[in-house]
Amino acid sequence: MTVLHSVDFFPSGHSPVAIEPRLPQAAFPEHHHDFHEIVIVEHGTGIHVFNGQPYTISGGTVCFVRDHDRHMYEHTDNLCLTNVLYRSPDAFQFLSGLNQLLPQEKDGHYPSHWRVNQSTLQQVRQLVTQMEQAEENTESHALASRELTFMQLLVLLRRSSLVEGLENNDARLNQLMAWLEDHFAEEVSWETVADVFSLSLRTLHRQLKQHTGLTPQRYLNRLRLIKARHLLRHTDESVTDIAYRCGFGDSNHFSTLFRREFSWSPREIRQGRDASLQ
């Protein structure tokens, strides 16, 4: 597995933070780092495999990667990211207690993926630009300013994720997408889902297409197929059982959609035929 080292990314040994744009981010094999990073998805879509678990990401997704996490990107479509790198929560010269602003693992669950709305994303871009512009200055006041801006970023992300609520259509769509990640295997009535999240059906279709490039049903099918591929790789369950477990009522229809999405059949994935592409 590829290991990325801080010496190759941070401008100097004194720099607490480094900014790495990926415009766009191509598919990238599994790797980990000796530093931490916050991945901010600007726009586009892709699959983020995080510690073996697949997540569909799009504009507004924020992922917190620790130095022992492993991750990779697959099936990227104009996926544009900004990576905010930092050595560790305890490696800042002027800040302490940052762990309280970061997601915390509890009972074996690490809430690595957050979502923010477009308004917050604009504010995030401004803070990232401030840090990027001062990257080369190693004077104490400049380092302190960058650390303060980094803390502002954490506060903004945490506040936005906690109080987003149902304030506007953008926020409601974010909550809907998070709900689909957990309920992908259920039978979904888009009329009912739209009503639950206080969206008109037309708004749901339009906004999901803008965020992901996919219609609601195609987005749901992709979620199901991604989860199914993970089970094919990591369990011994039959193709039929996996199809039903992931929300498909017909295994033949599942196999057709699977090949169309990944260019491999479920059986070929089970046999590891795609291993060279992982």
UniProtKB/Swiss-Prot annotation:
SUPFAM superfamilies reported for this sequence: Homeodomain-like (SSF46689), Regulatory protein AraC (SSF51215)
Ranges in coiled-coil conformation: none
Record GO terms (molecular function): DNA-binding transcription factor activity; sequence-specific DNA binding
Gene Ontology cellular component list: cytoplasm
DNA-binding region listed in the record: 191-212, 239-262
Domain HTH araC/xylS-type: 174-272
Entry function: Activates expression of the rhaBAD and rhaT operons.
Listed name of the protein: HTH-type transcriptional activator RhaS
Lineage: Bacteria, Pseudomonadati, Pseudomonadota, Gammaproteobacteria, Enterobacterales
